[in-house]
């Protein structure tokens, strides 16, 4: 595992990934105000008070394993192909929230060497390959910098868009499981799916 690295700023061809901080709270509120963004998570927009709670949870999780946490993604020119990553977030376009916390859910392993990959993009940036681009950077960070043994990702089985990102970055399907929900969303009867990337898979993909 990495030693005292902190959570670094990351950069891709089109995106600047800045570690989540309290100054980003209003952007989280804006993101979660769109019910379509949360269709497969909450099935509705979230209130400001709900975002207060999730922001606090994210900030706490970001400190549990050095180098892991949450990033706010910023871009330029609508995230179009060929658009450059901004030099800094000042004046840049907010694209979404990228996630790589330690695994922590009820249906996830209690193992600090396992991280969970996630992504939540503002709707105007969908279908441009930005979630895939950011996910590749987070996987590289997880294995090459932090030293994780495994990265998992979970979503509703019917969420074909999210599953497509997982498959496009080389993750493999592991299982379908059926959590018990108090207020199940449409499509939840098909269950949740889990994908993974192991260190061995990552090494093989890099040809080393």
Please place each PLM-identified region on the residue numbering:
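Acyl-donor (CoA/ACP) binding surface of acyl/acetyltransferases
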Residues: 1-40, 54, 74-208
């Amino acid at each position: 595992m990495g030693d005292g690295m902190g959570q670094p700023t990351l950069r891709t061809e089109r995106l600047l990934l800045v570690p989540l901080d309290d100054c980003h709270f209003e952007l989280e509120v804006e993101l979660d105000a769109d019910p379509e963004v949360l269709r497969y998570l909450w099935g509705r927009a979230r209130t400001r008070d709900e975002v207060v709670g999730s922001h606090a949870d994210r900030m706490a999780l970001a400190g549990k394993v050095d180098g892991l946490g949450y990033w706010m993604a910023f871009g330029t020119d609508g995230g179009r192909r060929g658009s450059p990553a901004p030099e800094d977030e000042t004046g840049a376009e907010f694209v979404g929230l990228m996630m790589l916390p330690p695994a922590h859910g009820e249906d996830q392993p209690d193992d600090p060497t396992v991280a969970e990959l996630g992504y939540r993009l503002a709707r105007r940036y969908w279908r441009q390959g930005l979630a895939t681009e950011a996910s590749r950077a987070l996987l590289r960070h997880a294995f090459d910098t932090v030293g994780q043994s495994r990265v998992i990702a979970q979503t509703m089985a019917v969420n074909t868009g999210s599953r497509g990102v997982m498959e496009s970055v080389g993750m493999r399907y592991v299982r379908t499981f059926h959590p018990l929900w108090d207020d199940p969303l449409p499509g939840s009867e098909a269950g949740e799916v889990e994908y993974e990337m192991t260190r061995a898979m990552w090494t093989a993909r890099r040809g080393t």
